[in-house]
């Protein structure tokens, strides 16, 4: 899998990105890119195939699979109901992969003068990454962390955990993480 985060969906007309554009670069491996708005994903044909997304796939209630004028799948998936069909197939990142990504992001942000950022999709495993980066001195900017809450209602069972994580941030890395 090739995965990426943070592309600007406004770079294509109507935010409609074509799987064929990714296929030209990576035709043999699934690619999934999450837009900076966290509401859109751009995927290649291989990812669509693995997810079983075809022109006959019913439109999800809480999402949209964009189609080309000829009825074929475009490669842009909007909202949870559509892009979760691909995201649920992604292999999990391990701690080392997440830590390397945090270091790369910190270096990139620092080189541009960024002093504050928000991560709008934090889960328990990524919390550990943020804390490690902050405690090790590798984090060179402040970050506001927002916990991911699944739209299907599972989030309601996680409210206590969200509160405990906030308390933990306040105790362990109050100068860098909020």
List PLM regions with ranges.
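Divalent metal-binding segments
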Residues: 1-166
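Short, intrinsically disordered, charge-balanced linker/junction segments flanking boundaries
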Residues: 166-178
